[in-house]
Design a protein with these regions (language model features):
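N-terminal small/glycine-rich loop or linker at the start of catalytic domains
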Residues: 7-23, 83-99, 123, 128
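Short acidic capping loops at alpha-helix termini that bridge into adjacent secondary structure
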Residues: 14-15, 76-80, 122-126, 155-156, ...
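Structural motif
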Residues: 38, 42, 118-119, 152, ...
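Active-site groove signature of glycoside hydrolases
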Residues: 116-136
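Beta/alpha (TIM)-barrel catalytic core signal, keyed to glycine-rich beta->alpha loops juxtaposed to Asp/Glu
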Residues: 132, 136-317, 330
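Short, acidic/polar
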Residues: 27-39, 104-119, 167-172
Length: 330
C-alpha cells in the first residue's frame, strides 16, 4: 500500500479509503468484519463512515459494526485512521426531532458522544461535516469543534459535499478565531464521468491545504465496465445509473471508455481508481466493497500507473469542465 499525508496535516493515510456505507444494509456483520480485516492486512489504514449509515430505522448500525470489530481487540483501533460524519437527522424516518440534525453546537456535541459509543472508541480522528448547514454560523460550529478537540474526542475536522466558497468561509472563520487549523479534508463526488469538482471545489481545497477524498469513484458502478457486464447477463442498473444509461450520449461515452480499455487489456474499474490517484490534490478515493473480491480489485489499482497516452485518451472520452474558476484571468 502507498501512503500520503492528509492535506496539510502530518497524518499519514493510505491512498485507498475503505468506505463502509454497505456495512449493515447490504453486507452483514461477519462479512463486514472480514472486509475490514482484509483491508487492514493490505495496508489500508483510512476507514470512512457516517452516523447515519445503516439508514432508515437502522441509522447508526454501520458505526456499531465497526465498533464491534474494534472490540475484538488486537491493535485494530491503533492502526486505523477513523473518519465519521455528522449532519443527518438520526431520528427514525418520519420521526425527526428538532436539534437532532445539522451542525448546531447542541447536535454536534450529542452526535459525537453517540458516535463514540457506537464505535466503542474514545476518539474520532477525522470528524466530517456531511453537508453544508445554511442555518448555523461557522463561529458556532468551530466553537463546538474547539471544545471537542480540547476534550480529546476528535483530532481533525473535515467537510463533505461543500462548495468551494464554503470551504473558504469555513477556514477563513477558523483563521479569524485563532487556535484551530480549520478543515483539513473535503469529501466530494469526483470521478472520470463527473468532473465538476475541478471547477472550484478542488481549487479551493488545494488553496486551503485540504486533502480531497472522492466518493463514488466508479460513479455508481458505471465506470466498472457496466455495459460489458450487462451484455454478459450481469445485474441491471437501477436508479440514477439506469437514468444515465438511458441517455444515448452518456451511453456512447461509456462504450468508448470500455472499448479503449479493452484495447489496452485493462479493467475499467481499476483504471477509474488509478486515474483519480493521478489527480492533483487527491488523497485517495473511497472504495466501498460489498465483498472481499471487490476489495482485491481496488487494491490492484494502487499499483497501476496509467501512461500519459492513456490519460490523454481518457480526457478525450471524458473531458474536464474547463479552466474555471480562472477562465478569464491572466
Amino acid at each position: 500500500m502507498k501512503y500520503t499525508q492528509l492535506g496539510r496535516t502530518g497524518l499519514k493515510v493510505s491512498r485507498l479509503v475503505l468506505g463502509t456505507m454497505n456495512f449493515g444494509p447490504q453486507t452483514d456483520e461477519a462479512d463486514s468484519h472480514a472486509i475490514m480485516d482484509a483491508a487492514l492486512d493490505a495496508g489500508i489504514n483510512f476507514f470512512d463512515t457516517a452516523n447515519v449509515y445503516g439508514w432508515g430505522e437502522n441509522k447508526g448500525r454501520t458505526e456499531e459494526i465497526i465498533g464491534n470489530w474494534f472490540a475484538k481487540g488486537g491493535d485494530r483501533r491503533d492502526k486505523v485512521v477513523l473518519a465519521t460524519k455528522v449532519y443527518g437527522n438520526m431520528g427514525a424516518d418520519g420521526e425527526a426531532w428538532p436539534n437532532h440534525d445539522k451542525l448546531s453546537a447542541l447536535n454536534i456535541r450529542r452526535a459525537v458522544d453517540a458516535s463514540l459509543k457506537r464505535l466503542q472508541t474514545d476518539h474520532i480522528d477525522l470528524y466530517q461535516f456531511h453537508h453544508i448547514d445554511r442555518d448555523t454560523p461557522f463561529d458556532e460550529i468551530w466553537q463546538a469543534i474547539d471544545v471537542l478537540v480540547q476534550q480529546g474526542k476528535i483530532l481533525y475536522a473535515g467537510s463533505s459535499n461543500f462548495p468551494g466558497y464554503k470551504i473558504a468561509q469555513a477556514n477563513e472563520t477558523a483563521a479569524r478565531r485563532g487556535g484551530g487549523i480549520g478543515l483539513v479534508s473535503e469529501q466530494c463526488l469526483y470521478n472520470l464521468f463527473e468532473r465538476r469538482a475541478e471547477m472550484e471545489v478542488i481549487p479551493a481545497a488545494q488553496d486551503y491545504g485540504l486533502g480531497v477524498i472522492p466518493w463514488s469513484p466508479l460513479h455508481g458502478g458505471l465506470l466498472g465496465g457496466v455495459l460489458k457486464k450487462q451484455a454478459e447477463g450481469g445485474r441491471r442498473a437501477s436508479g440514477r445509473a439506469a437514468d444515465t444509461l438511458a441517455d444515448p450520449a452518456a451511453r456512447a461515452r461509456l462504450q468508448a471508455y470500455e472499448d479503449l480499455l479493452d484495447k489496452h487489456g485493462l479493467e475499467p474499474g481499476e483504471v477509474a481508481l488509478a486515474w483519480l490517484l493521478t489527480r492533483p490534490g487527491v488523497t485517495g478515493p473511497i472504495v466501498g466493497p460489498r465483498t472481499a473480491g471487490q476489495l482485491e480489485s481496488a487494491l490492484r489499482a494502487v499499483e497501476l500507473e496509467p501512461s500519459g497516452e492513456l490519460l490523454d485518451a481518457l480526457d478525450e472520452v471524458f473531458p474536464g469542465p474547463g479552466p474555471s474558476p480562472e477562465a478569464f484571468a491572466w
